[in-house]
Amino acid sequence: MSQLEQKLTEMLTAPVEALGFEMVGIEFVRAGKHSTMRVYIDHPDGISVDHCAEVSHQVSAVLDVEDPINTEYNLEVSSPGMERPLFKLQHYIESVGEVVTLRLKMPMGDRRNFKGKLLSEADGMLTIEVDNQEFVLAFANIEKGNVVPTFD
């Protein structure tokens, strides 16, 4: 998570939670002049378009006052979806047993990307099985993670 994403998460978590939603995480994607801020929310009963609009309105109001971003951007509010992004250690713990993709900040040997079954978490270390080989990765070294949807 970048410093900007961390700052935005800290700034927007309370307003999102005050509306009754979980702040799953924030991605800020720079693409030339067209940056996008994605706010992922969740709720035990699911997320509707009306929920996204409500959170978008609240988040926009906070961002208009705080003005933490010095470039133009589009705001997107959505549920995490089937390819649920994993932001917090708790998200990884909840995903043990599922297939995930992980990208590391710093390579492990010559490898930076992993796709496999998340086997366990212990003291901030994640064990993932890729092609019948186990890798133990530090949560602190994970740049990005997502659940891979499986259809059984």
Swiss-Prot record:
CC terms in the record's Gene Ontology section: cytosol
Transmembrane segments: none
GO-annotated biological processes: ribosomal small subunit assembly; translation
UniProtKB keywords: Cytoplasm, Ribosome biogenesis
Gene3D superfamilies: Ribosome maturation factor RimP, C-terminal domain, RimP-like superfamily, N-terminal
Record has Amino-acid biosynthesis as a keyword: no
Subcellular location: Cytoplasm
InterPro entries for the chain: Ribosome_maturation_RimP, RimP_C, RimP_C_sf, RimP_N, RimP_N_sf
SUPFAM superfamilies in alphabetical order: YhbC-like, C-terminal domain (SSF74942), YhbC-like, N-terminal domain (SSF75420)
A Pfam family the protein falls into: DUF150_C
Keyword Ligase: no
Similarity-based family: Belongs to the RimP family.
General function of this protein: Required for maturation of 30S ribosomal subunits.
NCBIfam families hit by this protein: PRK00092.1-1 (NF000927)
Protein name according to UniProt: Ribosome maturation factor RimP
Organism: Pseudoalteromonas atlantica (strain T6c / ATCC BAA-1087)
Name of the gene encoding the protein in the UniProt record: rimP
